[in-house]
Amino acid sequence: MYVNISSDVFIIKITLIFLAAPNDEKAEIELTYNWDGDELGEGSRNFGHLAYRVDNIYDFCQKLMNYGVEINRPPRDGNMAFIKSPDGISIELLQNGDPLEIKEPWSSMKNIGTW
């Protein structure tokens, strides 16, 4: 594994580090360091959450729902959603590329629980 990119984002006071396996830069792990030392939630296992890019966030969330997965934060904006793994790890889903057009039923769905 090697550091692909490292950058400081001064406006929101974080440092981002992207790690990738040699010869496979498509699969990255993003580590975020919060300069203010924000406390992690109970059961966080020392990290905030995992994130994955998906080709169509609406289709992906619908497939998850069809399998009984609860969407904690629906993709109302056509760009981002949150779910939790069976053992409580928060997982962020991000639309690959530009956000999709906002549409129903997603835009009216409410948040469920925490993420």
Please tell me what each predicted stretch does.
Residues M1, I11-L16, L31-W35, K63-M65:
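Short amphipathic alpha-helical surface micro-motifs
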Residues L16, G43, P105-W106:
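Short aromatic-enriched loop/helix-cap "lid" or pocket-rim segments at secondary-structure transitions
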Residues D98-G113:
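A short, polar/charged loop-to-alpha-helix boundary motif
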